[in-house]
Amino acid sequence: MDTTLSHTPGSRLSQYLALTKPRVTQLAVFCAVIGMFLATPGMVPWKVLLGGTVGIGLLAGSAFAINCLVEQKIDAMMRRTAWRPSARGEITTLQILAFSTVLGGLGAWTLYTFTNPLTMWLTIATFVGYAVIYTLLLKPMTPQNIVIGGASGAMPPALGWAAVTGAVPGDAWILVLIIFVWTPPHFWVLALYRRKDYENAGLPMLPVTHGEQFTRLHILLYTVILFAVTMMPFISGMSGAVYLTSAVLLGAIFLAYAWKIYRDYSDALARRAFRYSIVYLSLLFAALLVDHYARPVIGM
């Protein structure tokens, strides 16, 4: 029986889609959309909402495709990523480059046409920072790759805000700071239970270079900092009681996970904490949105 993979149109499309890391792209776009709605007391113009969502999503996908291209040999050595079409050699380097270029070009054009030049240039800079500075320089060179490189991944709320207002005020940077501080514990938890993967691939992730105990301590410390930072929208007056209540409850659960990881680590616990960290960020930003529109109604 011939078991060779047949590249039907459907399977080929799914391979290209996989290069864009759809789940990560969705979370980035979600945070950008929340930034759009928080930027205005009313509703976001449909043209800006649609154009900003599509444009940011396309440029994000373009950056992730470049990441898959650069890391195809590394991905092939890691169980978590060995399935990727780029790692398996199912899509050529030229095809990935062409795909990324088309996505990036369409994304830039969409943002320029439907939002404003500032959003286009900020988005290009953001995802170049991820695809080039983080992927090529930081990730293979320093265990602080996630901390420094997290700046590019934290930008989506500012991109969304800029799409609506043409500016990036202080409130937008608070949202960026939340994601920036969230990024290290989110990825370090993953790196703990995938330590062998990173070690085999020669990547200097924190558990590989500094050990498990050091990483567990820093997950706890960053989660404490994150809890404090998530109070800033309420303190600054950007958000009210609905958000504050949500941030405290969600943060308390995250802190409980971080404390358990520090005191009594297991891979199973780390997996649950990693999954929760994604749920945490999604619900936190959803709470910002609900509070934004509920606050004038309930007066809190």
UniProtKB/Swiss-Prot annotation:
Q: In which pathway does it act?
A: Porphyrin-containing compound metabolism; heme O biosynthesis; heme O from protoheme: step 1/1
Could you tell me the Gene Ontology terms of the biological process aspect for this record?
Answer: heme O biosynthetic process
Q: Transmembrane region positions?
A: 24-44, 48-68, 94-114, 118-138, 146-166, 172-192, 217-237, 239-259, 278-298
For the keyword Cell membrane, the answer is yes
Q: Which InterPro entries match?
A: Protohaem_IX_farnesylTrfase, UbiA_prenyltransferase, UbiA_prenylTrfase_CS, UbiA_sf
UniProt subcellular location = Cell inner membrane
Q: Which domain of life is it from?
A: Bacteria
Listed A to Z, the keywords are: Cell inner membrane, Cell membrane, Heme biosynthesis, Membrane, Transferase, Transmembrane, Transmembrane helix
Q: Does the keyword Cell inner membrane apply?
A: yes
Topology versus the membrane: Multi-pass membrane protein
GO CC, alphabetical: plasma membrane
**Additional notes on this entry:** Carbon 2 of the heme B porphyrin ring is defined according to the Fischer nomenclature.
Functional note: Converts heme B (protoheme IX) to heme O by substitution of the vinyl group on carbon 2 of heme B porphyrin ring with a hydroxyethyl farnesyl side group.
Q: Which NCBIfam families match?
A: cyoE_ctaB, PRK04375.1-2
Q: Which PANTHER family does the record associate with it?
A: 4-HYDROXYBENZOATE SOLANESYLTRANSFERASE, PROTOHEME IX FARNESYLTRANSFERASE, MITOCHONDRIAL
Q: What name does UniProt use for this protein?
A: Protoheme IX farnesyltransferase
Q: Which organism is it from?
A: Burkholderia thailandensis (strain ATCC 700388 / DSM 13276 / CCUG 48851 / CIP 106301 / E264)
Lineage of this protein's species? Bacteria, Pseudomonadati, Pseudomonadota, Betaproteobacteria, Burkholderiales
